[in-house]
Amino acid sequence: MLAILDYKAGNQTSVQRALNKLGIPNQITSDKEVLSKATGIIFPGVGAAGQAMDELTSGGLDELLKDLVQQKKPLLGICVGCQILLDYSEENDTQALSVIPGECRLFNPSWEDYEGVPIRVPHMGWNQIELKQDCILFKDIDPEAHFYFVHSYYPAPEEKYIIGETIYGRPFCSLHGREGLWAVQFHPEKSGRPGLKLLSNFYEYCKEVSDA
């Protein structure tokens, strides 16, 4: 069973609808025992980084997440959940979870697209991922596939944790982490067939690890 972390700052219901469509058993929960026993955890998030961290820390879920990552529990962070796995976010001057070294930065509106036009902030719409490392999440996904983004801040982890990049004015990290701990800036639950496949790949990985 996949646990969808409920901390009042996520897009839990849209993630759950996607998992239900795939027939993947899941539960939206903030119960620490349920989270600890889950096959894997999806850590969604929308809104502001500061509010998200406040909600996590108020219930002690920040320390639980760190402990579960230390125990190699598979975890997938989405959007704000992706960003606050890093050390720091410029949004609200937020000290984050420090699970992955790096920080989250505001897009520079002076960046220009391929036509020389300044980019719009937030980055909103469909874009591609260029993998910099092999990633099991992208198994059997078309390299030309597009995923849905909506964000004003982007993750900037240490280089060795960058798994995929997307171009918006210039390249930025849109997928980071390591095996068993992944963070995506885009919304797989809103990305049609490629996004559903990514979620399915995450679940299959979780089952393999659980059965090992």
UniProtKB/Swiss-Prot annotation:
Any single GO CC term annotated in Swiss-Prot or TrEMBL for this entry: cytoplasm
GO terms, molecular function: glutaminase activity; imidazoleglycerol-phosphate synthase activity; lyase activity
Endoplasmic reticulum found in the keyword field: no
Pathway(s) the chain acts in: Amino-acid biosynthesis; L-histidine biosynthesis; L-histidine from 5-phospho-alpha-D-ribose 1-diphosphate: step 5/9
Keywords, alphabetical: Amino-acid biosynthesis, Cytoplasm, Glutamine amidotransferase, Histidine biosynthesis, Hydrolase, Lyase
EC number: 4.3.2.10, 3.5.1.2
Highest taxon in the source lineage: Bacteria
Subcellular location: Cytoplasm
BP GO annotations: L-histidine biosynthetic process
Primary location group: cytoplasm
Catalytic residue list: C79, H187, E189
Catalytic activity: 5-[(5-phospho-1-deoxy-D-ribulos-1-ylimino)methylamino]-1-(5-phospho-beta-D-ribosyl)imidazole-4-carboxamide + L-glutamine = D-erythro-1-(imidazol-4-yl)glycerol 3-phosphate + 5-amino-1-(5-phospho-beta-D-ribosyl)imidazole-4-carboxamide + L-glutamate + H(+); L-glutamine + H2O = L-glutamate + NH4(+)
Domain Glutamine amidotransferase type-1: 1-212
NCBIfam families tied to this protein: IMP_synth_hisH
Function: IGPS catalyzes the conversion of PRFAR and glutamine to IGP, AICAR and glutamate. The HisH subunit catalyzes the hydrolysis of glutamine to glutamate and ammonia as part of the synthesis of IGP and AICAR. The resulting ammonia molecule is channeled to the active site of HisF.
Cited HAMAP family: HisH
Subunit details: Heterodimer of HisH and HisF.
Protein's UniProt name: Imidazole glycerol phosphate synthase subunit HisH
